[in-house]
């Protein structure tokens, strides 16, 4: 059996495509929420006159310090979210563009990969969706995965057999 780590990685990316896409959307939403919270203008509380004496209830951290720490925490979250996005978003963009290119080259192969790996459909359902037999669907899935892997990681990811020529002397 032929084994290639790049093909296994592409298969895993396809299987988790919806999960990764939703994660990217959620992280972008979290970044927007943190930025909106940073844009809010913080105003310190006004001193109040209380009939009871004291210095404010023994609170050790002032409200201004709490707001400053909250801003620092929000900025730290934004940096973490952006680092997470920098890891996964280029990969998903590359997968999207490679799938679009595969669809332009061979729509049947793109349908097979989408149905079988992204939608997690059975081979029978995939064959109906791609309008081909189950056996043909399985064979084409292997070649389509190799093609998609080559598109994503370059020609070195899927080694091709070159011609072997023997010369007589």
Describe the residue ranges of each PLM region.
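Generic alpha-helical hydrophobic packing signal
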Residues: 14, 28, 106, 124-127
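DNA major-groove recognition helices of helix-turn-helix
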Residues: 137-151
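Short, conserved sequence motifs enriched in acidic/basic residues, glycine, and aromatics
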Residues: 103-104, 131
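N-terminal interaction/assembly modules
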Residues: 1-102, 153-169
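Helix-turn-helix DNA-binding module
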Residues: 119-136
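Short amphipathic alpha helix immediately N-terminal
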Residues: 104-121
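Generic recognition of cysteine residues
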Residues: 34, 55, 131-132, 137
């Amino acid at each position: 059996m032929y084994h290639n780590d790049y093909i296994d990685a592409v298969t895993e990316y396809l299987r988790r495509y919806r999960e990764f896409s939703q994660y990217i959307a959620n992280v972008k939403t979290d970044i927007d929420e943190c930025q909106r919270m940073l844009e809010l203008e913080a105003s310190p509380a006004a001193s109040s006159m209380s009939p009871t004496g004291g210095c404010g209830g023994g609170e050790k951290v002032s409200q201004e310090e709490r707001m400053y720490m909250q801003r620092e925490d929000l900025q730290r979250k934004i940096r973490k979210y952006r680092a997470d996005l920098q890891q996964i978003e280029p990969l998903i963009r590359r997968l999207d563009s490679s799938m679009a290119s595969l669809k332009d080259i061979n729509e049947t192969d793109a349908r097979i990969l989408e149905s079988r790996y992204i939608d997690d459909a059975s081979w029978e359902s995939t064959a109906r969706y791609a309008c081909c037999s189950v056996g043909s669907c399985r064979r084409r899935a292997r070649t389509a995965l190799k093609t998609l892997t080559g598109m994503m990681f370059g020609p070195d990811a899927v080694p091709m057999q070159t011609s072997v020529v023997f010369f007589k002397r």
